[in-house]
Amino acid sequence: MATHSHPHSHTVPARPRRVRKPGEPLRIGVGGPVGSGKTALVAALCRQLRGELSLAVLTNDIYTTEDADFLRTHAVLPDDRIAAVQTGGCPHTAIRDDITANLDAIDELMAAHDALDLILVESGGDNLTATFSSGLVDAQIFVIDVAGGDKVPRKGGPGVTYSDLLVVNKTDLAALVGADLAVMARDADAVRDGRPTVLQSLTEDPAASDVVAWVRSQLAADGV
């Protein structure tokens, strides 16, 4: 597991932060393509942080509650701390264009659980253009994996380029699919304007140590 950053600058669009009310939890989005390992990462974050924080999770699926069901089955949090939105259409619409259903679900989680510290919002599987509305989350993680080949970071796209943290997942499979991790790290650094990139394998590090450390840094900056 390695963290990479690259100091040279690019012109990037400003991403305004949402205005939070006093006492509102930090909200971190977890997005990325289908099968990249978003739900497994959310599960790992819950396992590592549930002993120190008041947590909740909100998942997005098109027609099912598959991801929420997975998290409940694996008991990463009590069932009532895991909610699901069925988007009924393109996953990015519910996290970027019309976030009403997600905001309503967040309100319900906050009403049910006083003094939440953190809500993880997992998007449905989408492509490299998916990003979260700044009205929905305070920071966003974008997850890709090596199965798509080492060209994926080079292709860029808003998720790869502008997410607050890029995670290159399933690094243990790199040799099997012919992906060069050094190339992926280099190409990610080249487009991310110094934003951090983590290369990880949940098989080798089930605790997702580098991502957990990043989440803790976001919470510390937030005063949690």
Swiss-Prot record:
Positions with biased composition (Basic residues): 1-20
Residues reported to bind GTP: 32-39
Keyword Oxidoreductase carried by entry: no
Gene designation per UniProt: ureG
GO cellular component: cytoplasm
Keyword Nucleotide-binding set for record: yes
Region feature (Disordered): 1-25
Family to which the UniProt record says this protein belongs: Belongs to the SIMIBI class G3E GTPase family. UreG subfamily.
UniProt GO MF annotations: GTP binding; GTPase activity; nickel cation binding
Coiled-coil parts of chain: none
Function description: Facilitates the functional incorporation of the urease nickel metallocenter. This process requires GTP hydrolysis, probably effectuated by UreG.
Subcellular location: Cytoplasm
Name this polypeptide is given: Urease accessory protein UreG
Keyword entries, A-Z: Chaperone, Cytoplasm, Disulfide bond, GTP-binding, Nickel insertion, Nucleotide-binding
GO process terms (BP): urea catabolic process
Location, primary (coarse class): cytoplasm
Subunit structure: Homodimer; disulfide-linked. The physiological role of the disulfide bond has not been proven in vivo. UreD, UreF and UreG form a complex that acts as a GTP-hydrolysis-dependent molecular chaperone, activating the urease apoprotein by helping to assemble the nickel containing metallocenter of UreC. The UreE protein probably delivers the nickel.
